[in-house]
């Protein structure tokens, strides 16, 4: 059964939405409106550096809140063997030529930044980070090979984006463990011994997430239990000299790996948009063209110039893949 949701964003961390179900039966049940106040603040930090990411299940009007600093890398549960960095902490990485983790130390970090600057971001810094669009084939960490010798040591800056305290750099090496699991070797960059962790793929998650402090953690809902998320994250910008990595707050991420799709409906002014939102129904949904992509909403819902706030001339139609 498909679920369509229309969303009118009314404040930085509040959403109003109407859900309607599309079924084989042409009779649609009445839609219900709901408003969710997002729990983005982890402690006393400003909203522009909210410590939490918030994941929303729109059809269930549920949210899951997780600390952005609560995980470091994610192990893909799909057919390929891929590992992602935590873009919400702005983690960066570099792959070395070595495959002996004990032989890598602080000297290997000389000259490395593995980060970006809000005041002077550079195009050449893009290589430190995973593909912004979320293409799982374009991660900094290469696909994990079935041949152990091909899997090199990787240095990771865990990231300090959005007020996260700087933490020691980490060195890792990842191997395949049979046909459905990974072996992670990891240590602080100055350590000469390493820890080992086994991570099994499963059928209910897109990624199994790992914290270098706490091991395997539950820092994202199961793949079919969220539609969109709200977070501070690494993204990209163009200030005239090409794309550069740039950190943004209040970004909306779409669960594109689960097939969630989106349409943005823009109108002449706020009053027209509100009237269209109130009139939107199942027939409107059926006639709407939706698109896929991790950042189909991104920051388009809000304005920073000349005034900061939600853009009231638009709303969004979201369809899950269930």
Stretches with model-predicted labels:
Residues 15-19:
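C-terminal motif of bacterial Sec signal peptides marking the signal peptidase cleavage site
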Residues 21-322:
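Surface-exposed, beta-sheet-biased, low-hydrophobicity segments with strongly acidic/polar composition
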Residues 2-10:
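Sec-dependent signal peptide recognition
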